[in-house]
Amino acid sequence: ILTENNVVIFETLGENFVIDLNNILKELDDYVFVTSGDLPLLDGNIVKHIVDAANSEKTWTSVITTKSFQSSLNLIPECIVSFNEENYVHTGISIVNASKIKNMNSIKEDYLIINDKRVCLNVNTNSDFKLLSTF
């Protein structure tokens, strides 16, 4: 189904997410929407919102939520970033301008704050599935 809809699938060595992603991005010369496959509520409307809201001048824009929003959904956030005296949680979604990535040097990350359950409810465990079924 994916290839029938012109979705490009990349095979990697499976070393780790960061190395695999960087190796793929070095080969591309366009904007890339990066997400994990465990966000079952991610839909076309929220993807369009993210793409429209991302700053095309930035190399890397990560979608984050406030920690308080995730806590209100009874989620236990793992990857937290702090700025402006607030705690935020990475969702695993990014918009990347791959044409600006030619090596594995550190890249300045821009943030897009979206407090929406479609970007933060993932399914990795039975407890995640049970929590998801309450929405």
Language-model segment annotations:
Residues 43-127, 133:
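Conserved core of the sugar-phosphate nucleotidyltransferase
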Residues 3, 131-134:
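N-terminal hydrophobic targeting segments
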